[in-house]
From Swiss-Prot:
Swiss-Prot/TrEMBL domain comment: Forms a 10-stranded antiparallel beta-barrel structure able to accommodate a hydrophobic ligand in its interior. In fact, this fold hosts the heme group, which is located in a wide surface cleft.
Domain of life: Bacteria
Record's cofactor remark: Binds 1 heme b group per subunit, that coordinates a highly solvent-exposed Fe(III) atom.
Keywords carried by this UniProt record: Heme, Iron, Isomerase, Metal-binding
Organism from which the protein derives: Mycolicibacterium smegmatis (strain ATCC 700084 / mc(2)155)
Protein name from the UniProt record: Peroxynitrite isomerase 1
InterPro entries assigned: Calycin (IPR012674), Nb(III)_bact/plant (IPR022939), Nitrobindin (IPR045165), PeroxynitIsom (IPR054873), THAP4-like_heme-bd (IPR014878)
Motif, GXWXGXG: chain positions: 16-22
NCBIfam families from the UniProt entry: PeroxynitIsom
A GO molecular-function annotation: metal ion binding
CDD domains for the chain: lipocalin_heme-bd-THAP4-like (cd07828)
E.C. no: 5.99.-.-
Amino acid sequence: MIDLHPNIAPLAPLLGTWAGPGAGEYPTIQSFEYLEEITFGHVGKPFLTYQQRTKARDDGRPLHAEVGYIRVPAPDRVEWVLAHPTGITEIQEGTLTVGGDRITMDVKATTIGLTASAKNVTALARSFRITGDELTYTLQMGAVGQPLQHHLAATLRRTPA
């Protein structure tokens, strides 16, 4: 087993796979429910790997996926570097708070990259709360002429290894 890099030791409780239900809404689409799986891993370097995918709760059709990395450049700071197969990349930066069995991350996009065919996403922000074996998050999005606002929320549980 590769040792965890000391820079990301505060994020060690994230390691593993998390799964559970979520719900989404946005003014330009119908509300929806989904099932999500997130896996956090590491390779011994100063970042976590991140892989996420969702499927529709009603019929299991694939909905979304993203991959990336999480870095801790300072004890109270966190950076997310993500790529979406829909032609979107995002760099999010924000705060990291670790205390006991609780981790809180609040990040906001500082850079969003779009391919020519990607949806016009102009703003993204995420809030993560991890307590023991429960991970909750919300995601806000500004896109297609709409201001930054609530888009997604989910509660995931750690899955057995």
